[in-house]
Regions:
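Non-catalytic connector elements of ABC transporters
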Residues: 1-68
Length: 68
């Protein structure tokens, strides 16, 4: 998948906290943890789970998560 966003950080999913509508995903990037709040549907569509290798995509207005 190609993205125009340049701030892409490879990391590993540490935790996924599912709510009724939204979810909180915690990703380890090096020694740091980055949290992103995304829809529960996005977590399900991506099949995100602890241990998954992902990329955190940072834009000026949001933080997204990508799974290859």
């Amino acid at each position: 998948m190609s993205l125009s966003a340049r701030n892409q950080l490879p990391g590993t999913v540490e935790q996924v906290h599912l709510g009724e509508i939204m979810a909180r995903v915690v990703v380890r990037v090096g020694e740091n943890l980055i949290e992103s709040v995304i829809t529960r549907q996005s977590v399900e569509d991506l099949g995100l789970a602890q241990g998954d290798e992902v990329r955190v995509v940072v834009k000026s207005t949001e933080v997204m998560i990508q799974k290859d």
